[in-house]
Amino acid sequence: MATLQNPKDISRRKFMAVAGGVAGLAAMAAMGISAEHGECSANIPEIDIDNMTYAESEADLLVIGGGMAGLFATVKAHDAGSKVMLVSKGRLGSSGQTPFAKGIFAFDPSSTKISLDDFVDQVSRSALGTNNPVYTRQMAEHSLARVNELREWGFFESPLYNNCFNKPIKERNISVYERIVITHLIKEDGRIAGAAGFSLDEEKIHVFRAKSVILCTGAGGFKPNGFPICDLTHDGTVMAYHIGAKVTGKEWNDGHPGQATNAAACFDGWGNMFERKPGVTSVEVHHDLGVDLNYAAYMTANPIRMGRPGIRLQKKIEGGPFRPAEFNRSGPPEREQGPRKDPREGGAPPGMGGTPVGGSSAGMSIHKSEGLVPINEKCESNIPGLYAAGDALGSYMAGAIYTQVGSSLAGSAVQGAVAAEAAAEYCRGVEMPEISEAKMNEVQEEILAPLKREAGYSPAWVTQTLQGIMIPNFIIYIKKESLLKAALAYVEELRDHHMPMLRAGDLHELRLVFETSNMIISAEMKLKASIMRKESRCSHFRLDYPDMDTKNWNAWINICKGSDGSMKLEKQPFDSWPT
């Protein structure tokens, strides 16, 4: 991007556009804000906004996301008779957490030693009641069929998924739009009407009109180091929140560790997960990857040597997260439990050697425990026509702790198919919605606003500031009200002042602006839900409320945007659907 240090690279038009901001920058320097370091600076776009083009596409059903859930949502919606489009911020099968997931669970009644009922009961006991047994059963019941279809497409023959994902897509001649950043879900007359965003490869705004939308956008975090989620920022969840969808699961935490050596090098810690072919896992219910290690590190202030998940540390530490004794294990964990080399390469098995480092997946909850609130077993949200699947759906399939290895990928496949069939049925009963010209203009202005801003905050700097607020162990993992409220004050400042002033100079930075904004809203959700849940359970631990409270907190927390624009929180009792 051109800078003020290279005046010959600046046209007269661009110079005039930013000249008014220069005086402001001088004042900012007096306040200790340095444009040189990117906090706040003049914006000199590389893009001629006046030459941005516009494209509109239409289909019965729009699938957003190119991972496992998106694949099955697209294929099954087509097979159910809908005209389908798939749009992805990345590449089909190569973005989000799907490329990293190498274990997929299959419940095979012919070989499994326990019944389906027993499996669901085991998951419920491990999850301490936080799972939705309807979605637990649904995942197990349909997992084998989805695994068999993946086998037909060549899924288990390569560590890379793009080719096998493309096989059923190309056979059905389904339209796929890759490297499109969706920034807005569009609602008209109380129901979903489509989505809009921009291309990362050309100066073009895209509007997609559809009768129904299935969000397969995954979960997200705060772009932490050491775990492969840096392209996931809760985009789908936050877009849906802005149009009135209910969101759940923000107080829970994913406990995947990184490694202390080269902590920011994701491939160093998890490379074997990307390089090996996927496999099938069988029934083995765990209670893993909560915040046990975070608590141990907090209490001892020492590096914690990695042990087998489910096994208490040798040194007795008083208090901490409750683990059902039934799920304390003595055997080695499944291979995808921790970042280590494959034993065949001479390294220790995952989770059994080295020094772990926390915060590697900061901002993400347990798989399937956060996202849009389903109003039924069909992955349907409270917005007519809007569905979600996989990590974008707060189905509580496994509860608020990791229970069954491989069920995350299986759940994405199963829910993608379930959502597709329900959405296709919905499409048959409605007409194609009209999107008003006023709405089109409003969305386009919001997309282009960061490029038009004469000066503002760098999204990279705001992201780093947010990480400094949210990722400390004593904020997001080991919680107490005073610190949660202190962090919330900072996040609300970012929301109210810095977020409206984010600027972008090119398409890459424009993507970062929207991702940063989504992370700020997600941080607010996490802090407010963590303050509201006054107990400790599974992957949520409060120092000031260290015990489980079954009298008051056998409930999930749902979040929605009020009519005044403020964030509203409510309880939804376990074993119930939202009202």
What kind of feature is each model-predicted range?
Residues 22, 43-52, 57-59, 73, ...:
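Glycine- and aromatic-enriched mobile tails/lids
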Residues 212-264, 402-422:
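Glycine-rich loop(s) and the adjacent beta-strand/alpha-helix scaffold that form part
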Residues 57-59, 203-212, 382:
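Core beta-strand elements of the Rossmann-like FAD/NAD(P) dinucleotide-binding domain
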Residues 11-19, 28:
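N-terminal export leaders
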Residues 18, 50, 82, 89-204, ...:
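Conserved N-terminal/central alpha/beta ligand/cofactor-binding core
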